[in-house]
């Protein structure tokens, strides 16, 4: 009887492990050698500090830096080998190149591994590895650096290796076998997002390996894996263009620090350095540092249409809501539209002529007339107004130097700049921003929180005008920007971002998961801002069971959504007589969770305030984590949070409290409830007192 696939592959795995073990010993020796050489050089420099001439000292410093770099590389190789030992590869393809006699076996893993210059494992991003994701057994091809390679794929296998042990080895003719995908999707969620290289689907692979240099916009339904795909795309681009793109050249803009922590493992897990990540608020702080303050973005229960308390009494709303500031909602809606950007663009086009009134400049016998100064100012039309003044000041000095026959003292640039600044009719961006609202006849739509504090809705419009008047801090190092949760940002925020980051972008999100009741922009508005961008849709949802996604589909129909047919429990509805009983039932559900196999439970409430109140009650009996706007870490276990903070996260099990018709009743509430329910992977329960929301009837 012939050897089974599992026996054959287990034997091969033992051979690979043996070679990894040898490589590990060599790597450990390299690390120790580098440490010894570094310490020896350092000791020599200290002991002979007074005796070494400057040239030798310089050579020793160079040697020290080189030894340090070598040691860092050795440590990196060692860490990579440790990861490979646990799970060296996840697939095998046998490919016979046209004109060649025998097929070659390619084992595919997270990292490449060579032994005696022979490849043992190929990086999942290598050109040949793409056939695993794209091709079935039969005629196949891949794009190599030297051209397209044709041939035949004679074998495809998939493996699960964990802790160095082969759990399964399956023969397959197609891409990812359904049972493999089902096994991976049915696992409990780990503490943070993990790589998906063993289950990347064909349509996902096309996005990941897309090498176009422009902007890509990904519209993906809940659970489609869009964030993970975007991160894998970055890892692929870092591999493919390693000579001109490194991790320090990539920035991720995410909704909050918790989400940034949640996704932080993916890129390092794929063998790359961590990526710089920041939020829109942090970016605004960098740009406005020392100039203006701003209010943080309002909680949902502080926004006009978002929430009246669960009692149904609008007067019980917390915070600075519509009852205390009825104009806030109108201001936010006006500034969230594409038309608002068009108004700003029209104003910016007129701004230089409105704000600069050139006059004659004299210094002793030297004179630069107003007409000449005006021409020089217009010549620098692509620059912000105040930067143009610097350039005109340089031109005046150059002209003075040329015409200075009598060799008079050269005027100081600061003095020239002061004279030019006096020709401005408005002195700072705040004055310009006020003038914009006066010019469009909407003076009442600009209200400051206090003398030096902007409302959040004004921050990015202010920065957009600041870019035209004084100039923004541009990121010269960022060559690729990733923007997640694209539907939560307004057109003017994108317009300002384009000034700060004039680079390639990957923009992703789901316009079916709106979180802001006062934002009026659409996917079409975003596509208008990025004309020529490559646009892709992801309609297949992998996160939740078929039953959960079917349930969520009754709350809000997602156009084109295709749930993977992974079956589980029907979502539970728990009716309670009052809120006291509801709290008891939630505690019972927590006890059930703790006695089961699931690793993470998300208790998702409508607002931060509701989440904080329930957390205070639950924390007396259970170990729970409160995820709030100030949080910086995501932890497994039991988390209590708001819909806004839960966006992008996933949990094995989800409880949605207060799912009553008092709490979830507006169209915006419908979207919030949909988001909360689609965070669940395996089990979903909604609790309510009184009458349940009509969205789940």
Q: What does each model-identified segment do?
A:
Residues 1-197, 201, 205-206, 693:
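Extended, charged low-complexity regulatory segments
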Residues 85, 91-93, 100-103, 470, ...:
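Domain-scale macromolecular recognition modules
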Residues 238-481, 488-496, 504, 512:
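Alpha-helical nucleic-acid-binding subdomain
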Residues 92-94, 158, 217, 252, ...:
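A structural signal for short, well-ordered beta-strand segments and their strand-loop junctions
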Residues 248, 257-265, 269-273, 278-285, ...:
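Conserved helicase motor core of SF1/SF2 NTP-dependent helicases
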Residues 1-35, 39, 183-297, 320, ...:
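P-loop NTPase Walker
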Residues 186, 190, 330, 334, ...:
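Conserved phosphate/pyrophosphate-binding and hydrolysis machinery centered on Walker-type P-loop NTPases
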Residues 93-95, 161, 346, 575, ...:
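Hydrophobic side chains in beta-strands
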């Amino acid at each position: 009887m012939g050897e089974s696939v599992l026996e054959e592959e287990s034997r091969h795995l033992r051979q690979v492990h043996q070679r990894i073990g040898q490589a590990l010993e060599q790597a450990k020796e390299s690390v120790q050698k580098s440490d010894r050489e570094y310490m020896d050089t350092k000791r020599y420099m200290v002991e002979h500090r007074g005796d070494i001439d400057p040239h030798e000292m310089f050579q020793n410093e160079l040697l020290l830096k080189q030894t340090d770099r070598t040691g860092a590389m050795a440590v990196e190789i060692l860490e990579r080998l440790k990861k490979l030992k646990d799970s060296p590869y996840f697939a095998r393809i046998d490919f016979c190149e046209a004109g060649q006699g025998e097929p070659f076996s390619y084992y595919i893993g997270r990292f490449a591994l060579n032994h005696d210059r022979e490849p043992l494992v190929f990086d999942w991003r290598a050109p040949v590895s793409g056939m695993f994701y794209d091709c079935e057994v039969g005629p196949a091809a891949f794009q190599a650096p030297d051209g397209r390679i044709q041939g035949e794929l004679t074998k495809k296998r998939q493996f699960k290796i964990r802790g160095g042990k082969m759990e399964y080895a399956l023969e397959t003719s197609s891409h990812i076998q359904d049972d493999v995908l089902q096994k991976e999707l049915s696992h409990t969620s780990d503490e943070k997002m993990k790589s998906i290289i063993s289950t990347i689907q064909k349509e996902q692979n096309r996005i990941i390996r897309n090498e176009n240099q422009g902007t890509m916009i990904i519209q993906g339904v809940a659970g489609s894996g869009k964030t993970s795909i975007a991160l894998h795309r970055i890892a692929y681009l870092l591999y493919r263009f390693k000579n001109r793109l490194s991790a320090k050249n990539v920035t991720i803009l995410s909704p909050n620090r918790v989400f940034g922590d949640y996704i932080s493992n993916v890129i390092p897990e794929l063998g790359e350095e961590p990526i710089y990540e920041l939020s829109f608020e942090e970016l605004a702080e960098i740009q406005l540092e020392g100039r203006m303050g701003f209010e943080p973005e309002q909680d949902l229960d502080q926004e006009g249409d978002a929430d009246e308390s669960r009692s149904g009494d609008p007067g019980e709303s917390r915070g600075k809501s519509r009852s205390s500031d009825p104009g806030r909602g109108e201001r936010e809606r006006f500034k969230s539209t594409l038309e608002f950007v068009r108004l700003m663009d029209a104003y910016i086009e007129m701004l230089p002529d409105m704000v600069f009134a050139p006059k004659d400049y004299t210094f002793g016998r030297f004179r630069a007339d107003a007409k000449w100064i005006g021409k020089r100012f217009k010549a620098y039309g692509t620059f912000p107004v105040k930067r143009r003044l610097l350039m005109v000041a340089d031109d005046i000095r150059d002209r003075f130097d040329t015409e200075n026959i009598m060799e008079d003292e050269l005027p100081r640039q600061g003095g020239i700049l002061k004279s030019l600044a006096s020709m401005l009719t408005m002195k700072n961006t705040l004055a310009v921003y006020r003038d914009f609202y006066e010019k469009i006849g909407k003076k009442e739509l600009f209200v400051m929180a206090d003398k030096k504090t902007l409302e959040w809705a004004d921050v990015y419009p202010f920065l957009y005008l600041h870019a035209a008047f004084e100039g923004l801090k541009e990121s010269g190092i960022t060559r690729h920007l990733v923007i997640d949760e694209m539907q939560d940002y307004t057109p003017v925020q994108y317009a300002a971002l384009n000034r700060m980051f004039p680079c390639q972008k990957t923009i992703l999100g789901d316009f079916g998961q709106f979180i802001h009741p006062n934002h009026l922009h659409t996917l079409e508005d975003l596509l208008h801002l990025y004309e020529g961008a490559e646009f892709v849709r992801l309609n297949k949802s992998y996160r939740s069971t078929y039953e959960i996604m079917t349930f969520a589909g009754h709350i809000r129909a997602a156009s084109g959504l295709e749930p993977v047919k992974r079956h589980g429990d029907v979502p539970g509805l728990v009716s309670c007589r009052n809120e006291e009983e509801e709290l008891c039932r939630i505690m019972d559900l927590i006890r059930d969770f703790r006695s089961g196999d699931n690793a993470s439970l998300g208790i998702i409430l409508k607002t931060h305030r509701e989440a904080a109140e329930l957390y205070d009650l639950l924390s007396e009996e259970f170990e729970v984590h409160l995820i709030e706007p100030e949080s910086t870490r995501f932890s497994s276990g039991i988390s209590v949070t708001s819909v806004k903070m839960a966006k992008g996260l996933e949990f094995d099990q989800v409880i949605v409290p207060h799912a009553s018709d008092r709490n979830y009743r507006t169209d915006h509430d419908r979207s919030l409830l949909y988001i909360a329910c689609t965070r669940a992977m395996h089990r979903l329960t909604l609790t309510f007192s009184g009458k349940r929301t009509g969205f789940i009837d």
